[in-house]
């Protein structure tokens, strides 16, 4: 019971303003943080232990077309973007406000001194802040992760 209570007190939430974009106004907060009720936020439990690549948090931009709802017809493009945070991941409470650790938005991370642009050439992609799914497949396979299983 005490373990569960301690775990509940360590829960983090991510707050996203409902009328914003490009990573503006996003906050990672603890359970006891007070927030203004005047501002509209979408709150979600924060994934505190995400899968990391080389110590960096990342997300996937997947392109999907829904051309019909009845009958349902969905097309998923076979490539997409892997967007990285530009500072190594940390759950240290002193780092919760560091946007370059917790956010993967391109519009946020392009302002980081650690941002690495691959200039769209695909060369040196694995050391850049944005990858193709081809580079992700390579990284997964080098680490014993089945790309096909993940995307099945």
Segments from the language model and where they lie:
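Catalytic core of tubulin tyrosine ligase-like
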Residues: 4-152
